[in-house]
């Protein structure tokens, strides 16, 4: 058995008699270790882990370091063939094998549906909360003997998104029954098309109890560890005249770029950009912030244009950089240099990335997802961190960024707020 913390051992003991479990452990509490050990205890000959693309190598290395059975990267066709050779072998002669594949690729491998008598482990199971997504539909078609779900934010506080996960755990409650028992909602008439609005939740104690009965373990960091203090700094950035003009007219020219907000989505997009890479005040403030510290710094960003501006500042200051986004995952400078700047795109790096060698995060621009925002905080504030953690939010005054952060702090996706509450863009931001 792995050398586990007491609370991790307790989670395994609490679910020792179950073959369908969910470990909803707060970010940084070692879900990887708990999940892999549960998989080992279940003892299925064939095992499949589905995770984010950026986590495949981490999972492969974890199994190779701590266990004796083969672990294959199924995003590689050659290793996929080796995996199936091992499947044939262990089914005949015994033993164990595990394959690891990312969500985006799994549903493009229909042969995985032929697996039987296997353990299915979903890392960041919150990624199957959209029941109409191809990844979710594919996973729900699978026939695992055992299920292990891992997530720090299973639904980001939105219980209606639990359906697919609780069905995998064996709680076969009908969707309409779930909504009627646990969700307060109503329909708005949207020009003849009914729009479902969630008002809140009810009977949540009963819901949590039922989830416990079906193998769910919930655990927060502050229940088991005393982590260092978190200190937040909101750095006010002057908005530009271009932003103000765009708010009034919905059109503006910045350099060679003409921005036209001809609908709600494009207007929101360009307002965000005008608060980011188009705002020289923010770029200048970011430069000053980097100059004020020689420690490692993590910078979260949204758009490629922001990445270029951040890289330019780092180049000017002669700061080594590592980049984590959908195109690359290079942490060499982060690992080798004490003054490295790690530039992280939210979707690619806010989940499952351990950056605790740093104790400083800069939010160049905010995400729209409260889940990504919550996960990003834990990249440095996690088990093993010994230093006080500092967070810097670069917020353009009287702008969309203030509204976004207000929503995120309340646990609301900003896109949901726009569509469900019909935000008037002409309202003051104060």
Across the structure, where does each feature detected by a protein language model lie?
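Conserved pre-motif I regulatory segment
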Residues: 1-24
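Conserved P-loop NTPase motor "coupling/switch" region that bridges the ATPase
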Residues: 45-46, 81, 119, 127, ...
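Conserved helix-turn-beta segment of the N-terminal RecA-like "Helicase ATP-binding" lobe
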Residues: 55-79, 169-173
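Conserved helicase ATPase core of P-loop NTP-dependent helicases/translocases
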Residues: 83-87, 300, 308-349
């Amino acid at each position: 058995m792995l050398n586990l913390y007491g609370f991790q051992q307790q989670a395994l003991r609490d679910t020792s008699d179950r073959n369908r479990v969910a470990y909803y452990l707060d970010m940084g509490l070692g879900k990887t270790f708990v999940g892999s050990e549960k998989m080992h205890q279940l003892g299925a000959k064939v095992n499949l882990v589905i995770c984010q693309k950026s986590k495949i190598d981490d999972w492969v290395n974890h199994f190779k370091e701590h266990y004796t059975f083969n672990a294959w990267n199924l995003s590689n066709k050659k290793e996929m063939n080796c995996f199936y050779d091992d499947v044939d072998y262990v089914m005949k002669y015994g033993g164990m094998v595990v394959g690891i594949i990312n969500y985006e690729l799994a549903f493009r491998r229909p042969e995985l549906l032929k697996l039987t008598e296997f353990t299915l482990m979903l890392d960041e199971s919150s990624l199957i909360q959209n029941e109409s997504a191809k990844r979710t539909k594919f996973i729900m078609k699978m026939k695992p003997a055992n299920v292990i779900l891992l997530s720090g934010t299973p639904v980001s506080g939105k219980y209606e998104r639990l359906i697919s996960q609780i069905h995998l755990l064996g709680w076969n409650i009908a969707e309409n029954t779930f909504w009627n028992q646990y969700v307060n909602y109503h329909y708005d008439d949207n020009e003849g098309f009914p729009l479902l609005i969630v008002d809140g939740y009810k009977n949540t104690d009963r819901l949590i109890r039922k989830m416990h009965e079906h193998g769910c373990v919930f655990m927060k960091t502050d229940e088991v560890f005393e982590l260092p203090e978190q200190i937040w700094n909101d750095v006010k950035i002057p908005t530009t005249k271009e932003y103000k003009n765009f708010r009034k007219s919905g059109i503006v020219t910045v350099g060679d770029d003409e921005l036209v907000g001809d609908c709600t989505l494009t207007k929101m997009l360009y307002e965000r950009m005008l608060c980011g890479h188009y705002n020289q005040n923010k770029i200048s403030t970011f430069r000053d912030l980097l100059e004020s510290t020689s420690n490692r710094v993590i910078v979260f960003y949204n758009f490629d244009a922001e990445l270029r501006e951040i890289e330019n500042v780092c180049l000017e200051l002669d700061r080594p950089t590592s980049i984590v986004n959908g195109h690359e995952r290079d942490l060499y400078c982060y690992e080798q240099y004490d003054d490295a700047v790690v530039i992280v795109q939210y979707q690619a790096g806010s989940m499952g990335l351990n950056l605790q060698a740093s104790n400083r995060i800069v939010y160049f621009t905010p995400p729209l997802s409260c889940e990504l925002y919550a996960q990003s905080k834990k990249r440095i504030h996690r088990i093993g961190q010994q230093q006080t953690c500092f967070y810097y939010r670069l917020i353009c005054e009287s702008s969309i960024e203030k509204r976004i952060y207000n929503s995120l702090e309340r646990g609301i996706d900003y896109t949901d707020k726009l569509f469900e509450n019909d935000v008037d863009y002409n309202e003051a931001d104060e």
